[in-house]
Amino acid sequence: AITTYIFPLLRITSVFVLAATSWAFAAIKKPIVNSTSKKDLKYFRTLHSLAFTELGMKKSNVMQDEHYEDIGRKLGIEVTVYSNGEEKTGFVDSDSEYFNIINAARIKGITIEEEYNTDMYSQDIDKHMLQILKDEVDNYKYSYKLVDFTDMIEKFNVAELCPKYDVIFVDEAQDLSPIQWKMYDILKKNSKHVILAGDDDQAIYGWAGADVARFQSEPAKDIILPQSYRIPGAVQDIANCILNRIPDHRRIKKQWSPRPEKGYVEYVTSIEDLPLYS
């Protein structure tokens, strides 16, 4: 996909390549970094990075792990945040369901109560503490003039500070959350051409608010890439065993060929047998 679609686009002076998360961005940037000039790489961003830049923000404006932990201490909520000040999924990566519920609600554009009622969380949550925590977070950010990653997208969507582009290319679009889809709509309005790259079968960020249904229903000319250069046959067989159980109305059916080599799949019966730290 990169060779077929992105490299030709680099000849256009006004093209922006965007990714839903920093992990997706790293994957798309790697094969390109040696094939283009450094000045062109400024056109390769995550959605959060684009919002951050267009809003004229500085890193000192961004909520860090210690800020969330400070708020937790004030309210007697034990929390550890693992982002190291970097956006990976657009989601606050913490061990606190309180922070996760609040952020998920904002990303999805729903109320805290609606997110709480999704049955994704434990029964130990004090429902009344959720609003108290949200108010404390808002007050903390206001007092210290800080923003979080969700604020960046929200502020971009309100201000619509979007340059004009000939083409935007959005990678891993199946992982866009409702708030990111709103940002995409603004980008689309300010671009002559839009390419969405993604695969609903690879949607793994539902827990972080990914709106796969929006990706599936987006009006566009569908192009199914017929050949994978990454997946061997044995892995495709396992994947198809799972995917074929999904009702037709829940996914986009597609035909594609795996790599020539068959490969192999190992079955591991215990997590203790996985070399997680090697």
Predicted segments, located by residue:
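Low-acidity, Ser/Thr- and Arg-rich intrinsically disordered low-complexity segments
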Residues: 2-5, 11-14
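Conserved helicase motor core of SF1/SF2 NTP-dependent helicases
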Residues: 22-23, 27, 45-50, 174-262, ...
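Short, intrinsically disordered, charge-balanced linker/junction segments flanking boundaries
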Residues: 14, 104-105, 116, 270-278
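Conserved P-loop NTPase-based nucleic-acid remodeling module centered on helicase motor cores
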Residues: 28-101
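Short active-site oxyanion
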Residues: 13-16, 41
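Hydrophobic "anchor" residues on beta-strands that sit immediately upstream
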Residues: 42, 166-170, 194-195
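Short beta-strand-centered segment that lines the nucleotide-binding/catalytic pocket of NTP-utilizing
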Residues: 17-21
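Accessory N-terminal region flanking or inserted into the helicase ATPase core
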Residues: 81-169, 178-183, 206
